[in-house]
């Protein structure tokens, strides 16, 4: 078995920071220069890329961005403050979202899944019919 050295850990940290900086540059450039919806209201490849590369430190911003391009959000997007399962004295921001079967919203869900850290730390539940529940701690 290979022993993990201090130098190896430092190299991994540097590579991680470089990748993170490159992804932030891509997101910032796309947000500044590209259309997020096409002429029919579907999320563009640029929008899906932004969702899949969004930095994990900004969960609230991720949901704000996705909501801004979500089709039928008056019907399929609901936010609420709910008690946290544990500890009970804390609260979470809950996002109940439904795709309404619309392929544009389904493409956003797929882009969200590609952002594996964000998905793993916010996803709570999926149900048949395109219904999803996500939560973020209110202290984030």
Model-derived segments and spans:
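Non-catalytic accessory regions used for complex assembly or targeting
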Residues: 2-21
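Assembly/interface hotspot detector across virion components, adhesins/toxins, and nucleic-acid enzymes
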Residues: 4, 83, 121-125
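Acidic, low-complexity intrinsically disordered regions
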Residues: 8, 50-52, 58, 66, ...
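Residue-identity detector for glutamine
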Residues: 11, 18-19, 48, 93, ...
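An N-terminal amphipathic alpha-helical segment
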Residues: 21-92
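Generic structural motif recognizing short loop/turn segments at the entrances and edges of beta-strands
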Residues: 61, 89-95, 127-133
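Amphipathic, interaction-prone secondary-structure segments
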Residues: 77-113
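Short, compact, well-ordered microdomains
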Residues: 102-140
């Amino acid at each position: 078995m290979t022993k993990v050295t201090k130098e190896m850990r430092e190299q991994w940290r540097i590579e991680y920071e470089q990748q993170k900086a490159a992804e932030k540059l891509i997101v910032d450039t796309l947000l500044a220069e590209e259309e997020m919806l096409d002429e029919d209201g579907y999320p563009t490849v640029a929008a899906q890329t932004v969702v899949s590369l969004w930095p994990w430190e900004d969960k609230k911003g991720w949901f704000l961005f996705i909501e801004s391009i979500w089709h039928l959000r008056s019907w399929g997007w609901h936010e609420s403050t709910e008690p946290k399962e544990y500890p009970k004295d804390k609260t979470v921001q809950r996002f109940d979202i439904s795709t309404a079967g619309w392929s544009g919203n389904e493409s956003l869900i797929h882009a969200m899944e590609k952002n594996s850290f964000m998905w793993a730390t916010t996803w709570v539940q999926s149900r048949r019919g395109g219904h999803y529940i996500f939560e973020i701690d209110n202290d984030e």
